[in-house]
């Protein structure tokens, strides 16, 4: 603020209390943030927080990212939300611990090492398994180091010096021990059922390892001839499938009890057609016309002969029945029966059953006790047909690169040759793919190890149910809170409907299934599995000391079995555990076993993306219910996916990816963190260049607010403080009331993980209530008053605001609030992250005062709008040139205005409140009734110090100033 000067008038600028601060308006975050990271490490902020005594523990348990590749924007979102949860709870008085972790075993790393081998012309099979596992370990270690630094650069606090990793020896020992609890409690069994199988990676996959993409598939309509069916003998049941490769494994056809079927006779055919005149087809009536159209048959080329009761059909012959060279492979009669899962919404109204490749068919024949008659083993690990399968031996369902193999075409050609095909086509549909290789998967019956979710768990922990499923569902109902609440239903429905858990993988890099099976025994035999606590204890001790590699060492079987068992009577299992069992066991080796874990092995919060309802939330729940008897968490918090600015999924091919490292280099990590705080993370979020520009603009506005406070508090001391709010003007008491209200909002928001709500409330308060209103009004007092009560009150309020705004925003803007804090408290060990949210007295709340100020602000809006017209028309240059007359109809409002300095609030040199009706020419705002403003110029001279135009300017000891400024000059 400068004053006009003349030769006779002194320069008063140096007498003003102008803000003084070295806090720069330009943040320079990319360059400066690393300095604060170094400082925090030097002064040991995380460890010093752990030294605070008497605090209730709060534990957010980290869902481990995979130790493979640089961070993507989803990682940044995830870890930033976690960091805000941890920091805010620490500042609310908890001992908020955070142990970051990494998931290290599994297919993605194996795949990378195998890729390296392939480039060198080598195969994994050429290398000793322990040597291969060591290469996988080194690969994971390298990426852990890289990702750790990338996470730290985002300002994520935590025990980075001692994270948990699932390949640590202790972790591997506990994972094996948790598995052996399933072995001992009766839920582990070996079974054979269709599982999702990746021919490319040659292993079973969990649902969480599968993603769905559009795929073009062959679709065929195939004829099965009825036999032992009386008048229907020779008629053909038509099935439809999108997996022609499963036809050689067909064992049955099923129909729906409530579907109407008809017999259709072919009366004519076009030139190119696989139907013949006189053929009779059995079809669902609702689908018959569609099937005929697919077979190129016009409506006048077929007729409906009559109804068909499918229960009268005694059996079917396979289309390859009696085929020359078939060696009798398909010559037995195919079963034909009703099934609940058959519909007439698409296809033919019949379903071809290959129970080795479909779960519904498998379960149907399992429940009938007929599995032995219908299970085939035609498809090998690599997705090829067994070598001795007639016509198709050695044919691949998928090529080695994951493309279409030669199996489907070969099957279709053979069906054409034997007259078994009615129609063919292509269909584009959503199809499961391996999330790692991106290649399609198949369903394939293989021997696997399962954890039963419905067998009683014999561990004496039945408070929440006797089975894993019961315990999980009861935990969801009674023990776990969900944010957002929709996550509850999603997880519940998944657990309610899920099959048994496939634990085994046919891979090398993982924790092995540490169990032994008796040679010659069947999986259903009571002594099939060795259940011996002494053997288990030896395994655990060895893994603890040497890691899981010792399972593969020479003589391992003899070592673990000990002297009580003959090694040649037992087989050692070499499958490895599903990696979701690894991460699902973290409650044991992190929460239970670490000093910075939890007393009961249960976390306050698990927080991950919404895909983890079928991933980590899911596997952790199942695993803990099998060993703890209940869920391992009290709160499940879920975030959505990150999309580009147009709401499109990010992909390298579209060129719309946002890389966290690039954002940090351009804007700084605080801008990325602020984006997280501004968004509703519970839904899908959007990010892109324009969105980030908007975030940076919001940041600058907040930074400007903090800079103003720092400048105005440059020489503030305790002697300046006014302790009793009653001694303050109404405007300051209003700010105190708003602070108390906001303190409650902030604490409630942080406790409920509502960062968008916290940020929105604080940002609006800082920019609307403070910068655009309170600061704007009080600049005159702060700059021009002497040692007055109202200036002391304003600075007291600024100090109180400073301590609250910096701490409230510290969990979000970790770097900037540290910079702001150190500007006032630059001590060597000082940090905003070492303090708590200040206690804010509830007595500050004054709803009546808030209501009064709201009324005043409505009047002020009309005055400000009226003056803006005068400024626009160049009648005035500043509002201080005005002294308007404000006509207020409401007597209560007039009385309120009489109690305050309304001209100061409107930033005018004078203002008259009138009870007279407003004249016609008065300015009004339609949304604010009963207030009219008549513009008047201020009378008097311009004070050369405060710039107000007042009648008394020039009548005091100091030349060219008003009475207030004269008193300030002394």
From Swiss-Prot:
Cofactor binding comment, as recorded: Binds 1 zinc ion per subunit.
Binding site for Zn(2+): 943, 946, 962, 965
SUPFAM superfamilies for the chain: Anticodon-binding domain of a subclass of class I aminoacyl-tRNA synthetases, Nucleotidylyl transferase, ValRS/IleRS/LeuRS editing domain
Annotated InterPro entries: aa-tRNA-synth_I_CS, aa-tRNA-synth_Ia, Anticodon_Ile_BEm, Ile-tRNA-ligase, Ile-tRNA-ligase_type1, Ile-tRNA_ligase, M/V/L/I-tRNA-synth_anticd-bd, Rossmann-like_a/b/a_fold
Catalytic activity: tRNA(Ile) + L-isoleucine + ATP = L-isoleucyl-tRNA(Ile) + AMP + diphosphate
Motif 'KMSKS' region: where in chain: 649-653
Free-text note regarding domains: IleRS has two distinct active sites: one for aminoacylation and one for editing. The misactivated valine is translocated from the active site to the editing site, which sterically excludes the correctly activated isoleucine. The single editing site contains two valyl binding pockets, one specific for each substrate (Val-AMP or Val-tRNA(Ile)).
Family: Belongs to the class-I aminoacyl-tRNA synthetase family. IleS type 1 subfamily.
Protein name as annotated: Isoleucine--tRNA ligase
Naturally occurring in which organism (per UniProt): Ruegeria pomeroyi (strain ATCC 700808 / DSM 15171 / DSS-3)
Lineage, opening ranks: Bacteria, Pseudomonadati, Pseudomonadota, Alphaproteobacteria, Rhodobacterales
């Amino acid at each position: 603020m400068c004053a006009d000067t003349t030769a006779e008038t002194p320069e008063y600028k140096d007498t003003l209390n102008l803000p003084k601060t070295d806090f720069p308006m330009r943040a320079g975050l990319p360059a400066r943030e690393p300095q604060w990271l170094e400082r925090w490490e030097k002064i040991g902020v995380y460890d010093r927080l752990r030294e605070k005594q008497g605090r209730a523990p709060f534990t957010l348990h980290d869902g481990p990212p995979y130790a493979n590749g640089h961070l993507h924007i989803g990682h940044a979102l995830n870890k930033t939300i976690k960091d805000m949860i941890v920091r805010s709870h620490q500042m609310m008085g908890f001992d908020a611990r955070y142990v970051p972790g990494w998931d290290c075993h599994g297919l993605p790393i194996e795949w990378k090492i195998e890729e390296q081998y392939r480039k060198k012309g080598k195969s994994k099979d050429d290398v000793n398994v322990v040597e291969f596992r060591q290469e996988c370990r080194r690969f994971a270690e390298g990426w852990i180091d890289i990702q750790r630094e990338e996470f730290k650069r985002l300002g994520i606090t935590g025990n980075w010096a001692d994270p948990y990793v699932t390949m640590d020896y202790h972790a591997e020992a506990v994972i094996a021990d948790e598995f052996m609890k399933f072995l001992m409690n009766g839920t582990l069994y070996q079974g054979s059922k269709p599982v999702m199988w990746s021919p490319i990676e040659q292993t079973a996959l969990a649902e969480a390892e599968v993603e769905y993409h559009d795929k073009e598939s062959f679709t065929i309509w195939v004829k099965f001839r009825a036999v032992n069916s009386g008048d229907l003998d020779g008629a053909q049941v038509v099935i439809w499938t999108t997996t022609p490769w499963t036809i050689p494994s067909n064992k049955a056809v099923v129909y729906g009890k409530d579907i109407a079927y008809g017999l259709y006779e072919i009366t004519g055919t076009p030139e190119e057609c696989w139907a013949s005149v006189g053929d009779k087809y059995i079809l669902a009536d609702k689908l018959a016309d569609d099937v005929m159209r697919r077979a190129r048959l016009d409506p006048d080329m077929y007729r409906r002969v009559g109804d068909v009761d499918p229960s009268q059909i005694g059996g079917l012959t396979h289309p390859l029945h009696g085929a020359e060279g078939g060696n009798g492979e398909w010559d037995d009669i195919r079963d034909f029966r009703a099934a609940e899962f058959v519909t007439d919404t698409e296809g033919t109204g019949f379903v071809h059953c290959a129970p080795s490749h479909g779960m519904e068919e498998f379960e149907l024949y399992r429940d009938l006790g007929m599995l032995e008659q219908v299970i085939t083993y035609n498809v090998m690990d690599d997705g090829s047909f067994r070598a001795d399968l007639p016509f198709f031996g050695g044919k691949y369902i998928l090529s080695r690169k994951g493309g279409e193999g030669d199996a489907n075409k070969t099957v279709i050609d053979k069906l054409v040759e034997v007259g078994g095909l009615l129609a063919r086509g292509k269909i584009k549909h959503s199809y499961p793919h391996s999330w790692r290789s991106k290649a399609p998967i198949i369903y394939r019956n293989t021997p696997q190890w399962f954890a039963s979710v419905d067998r009683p768990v014999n561990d004496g922990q039945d408070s929440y149910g006797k089975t894993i499923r019961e315990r999980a569902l009861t935990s969801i109902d009674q023990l776990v809170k969900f944010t957002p609440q929709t996550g509850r239903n999603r997880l519940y429905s998944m657990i309610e409907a899920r099959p048994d858990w496939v634990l085994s993988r046919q891979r090398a890099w993982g924790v092995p299934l540490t169990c032994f099976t008796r040679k010659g025994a069947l999986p259903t035999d009571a002594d099939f599995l060795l259940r011996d606590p002494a053997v288990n204890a030896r395994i655990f001790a060895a893994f603890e000391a040497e890691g899981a590699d010792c399972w593969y060492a020479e003589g391992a079987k003899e070592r673990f079995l000990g002297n009580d068992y003959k090694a040649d009577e037992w087989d050692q299992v070499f499958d490895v555990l599903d990696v979701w069992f690894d991460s699902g066991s973290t409650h044991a080796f992190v929460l239970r076993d670490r000093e910075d874990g939890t007393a009961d092995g249960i976390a306050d919060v698990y927080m991950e993306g919404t895909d983890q309802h079928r991933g980590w939330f899911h596997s952790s729940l199942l695993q803990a219910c099998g060993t703890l008897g209940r869920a391992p968490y009290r709160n499940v918090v879920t975030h959505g996916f990150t999309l580009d600015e147009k709401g499109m999924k990010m992909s390298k091919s579209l060129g719309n990816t946002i890389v966290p490292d690039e954002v940090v280099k351009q804007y700084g990590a605080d801008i990325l963190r602020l984006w997280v705080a501004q968004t509703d993370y519970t839904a899908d979020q959007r990010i892109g260049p324009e969105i980030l520009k908007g975030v940076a603009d919001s940041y600058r506005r907040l930074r400007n607010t903090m800079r103003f406070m720092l400048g105005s508090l440059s020489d503030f001391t305790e002697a300046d403080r006014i302790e009793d709010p009653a001694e303050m003007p109404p405007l300051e008491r209003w700010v105190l009331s708003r602070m108390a209200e906001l303190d409650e909002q902030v604490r409630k928001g942080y406790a409920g993980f509502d960062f968008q709500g916290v940020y929105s409330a604080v940002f609006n308060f800082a920019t609307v209530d403070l910068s655009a209103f309170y600061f704007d009004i009080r600049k005159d007092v702060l700059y021009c008053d002497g040692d007055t009560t109202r200036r002391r009150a304003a600075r007291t309020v600024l100090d109180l605001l400073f301590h609250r705004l910096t701490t409230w925003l510290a969990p979000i803007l970790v770097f900037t609030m540290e910079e702001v804090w150190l500007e006032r408290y630059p001590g060597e060990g000082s940090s905003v992250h070492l303090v708590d949210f200040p206690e804010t007295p509830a007595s500050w709340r004054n709803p009546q005062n808030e209501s009064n100020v709201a009324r005043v602000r409505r009047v002020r809006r009309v005055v400000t709008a009226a003056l803006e017209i005068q400024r626009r028309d160049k009648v005035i240059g500043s509002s201080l040139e005005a002294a308007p007359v404000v006509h207020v109809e409401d007597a209560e409002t007039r009385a309120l205005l009489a109690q305050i300095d309304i001209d100061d609030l409107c930033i005018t040199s004078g203002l008259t409140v009138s009870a007279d009706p407003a004249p016609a020419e008065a300015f009004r705002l339609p949304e604010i009734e009963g207030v009219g403003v008549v513009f008047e110029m201020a009378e008097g001279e311009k004070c050369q110090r405060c710039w107000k135009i007042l009648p008394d300017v020039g009548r005091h000891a100091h030349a060219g100033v008003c009475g207030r400024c004269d008193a300030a000059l002394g």
